[in-house]
Amino acid sequence: MQFNRKEYLKDVKNIVVKVGSSTLTYENGLLNLFHIEHLVRQLVDLHNRGYNVILVSSGAIGAGVGKLGLSEKPKSIPEKQAAAAVGQGILLHTYEKIFAEYGKTIGQILLTKEDMIDEVRSCNATNTFNALLDKRVIPIINENDAVVVDEIKVGDNDTLSAFVSKLVKADLLILMSDIEGLYSCDPRINNDAELINFVEKITKDIISCAGGAGTDLGTGGMATKIKAAKIATSAGIPMLIVNGATNEVLQDVVEGKSVGTWFNAIK
């Protein structure tokens, strides 16, 4: 039986949206306000439609790089964490200002891996999410890059968004990328690459389609998105990869249009 997106989306309530550094910042690390405003407007519209919206946002380190006038993303952990500490405030202030223009309230939650795997801490995190959503607050999530160390870090926000989706019992996870979705091969170097619209199951062939690193200011590539898809779909949550630069792409998603790559949930 052919999968019907529109039919599934009728019962969707909780939507987690992850947006990456490549969408939020320019190559020099400064914030791309055009893309951020476009993103916020779409999220507000989803919220107005009655959805609970949870945003997992990258961009803190990138914003810090821009503010500190660095020429590239820092290599050492202390410098990365310093950039994150500076950038997180800039990023959240920007979000707060734009969301407030539409009368929306946001709440910041900075997580670590321990918040996902420790039973008590994950329960506390879930309770916090539920309290915010009950009050129609839009949570904005990032990993606590300013203090986390390699041993306890999630490492990328694709994976973080999948864990968050489990915590909030999301009905759909949307990863906004700088590419239309998963292709049969890398479309940047192969003109014959075809967009894969629907993935029933993550097989070795699907995994082989994902390769390459992310941008210099980010940590994720298609491989981390496949990892996120495994986590989400195994928890019964479908995941969608879409191009964050596409005009009104989130509206296309909730209206059931055939955009991006849909990873079906494991029943």
UniProtKB/Swiss-Prot annotation:
It comes from the Bacteria. Its main location: cytoplasm. It is found in: Cytoplasm. One of its GO terms (cellular component) is cytosol. It is an enzyme of class 2 (transferase). Its EC number is 2.7.2.11. Pathway: Amino-acid biosynthesis; L-proline biosynthesis; L-glutamate 5-semialdehyde from L-glutamate: step 1/2. One of its GO terms (molecular function) is ATP binding. Keywords: Amino-acid biosynthesis, ATP-binding, Cytoplasm, Kinase, Nucleotide-binding, Proline biosynthesis, Transferase. Pfam families: AA_kinase. Substrate binds at residues 58, 145, 157. ATP binds at residues 18, 177-178, 219-225. SUPFAM superfamilies: Carbamate kinase-like. It catalyses: L-glutamate + ATP = L-glutamyl 5-phosphate + ADP. The keyword Transferase applies. InterPro entries: AceGlu_kinase-like_sf, Asp/Glu/Uridylate_kinase, G5K_ProB, Glu/AcGlu_kinase, Glu_5kinase, Glu_5kinase/COase_Synthase, Glutamate_5-kinase_CS. GO terms for biological process: L-proline biosynthetic process. Belongs to the glutamate 5-kinase family. Catalyzes the transfer of a phosphate group to glutamate to form L-glutamate 5-phosphate. This is Glutamate 5-kinase. It comes from Clostridium tetani (strain Massachusetts / E88).
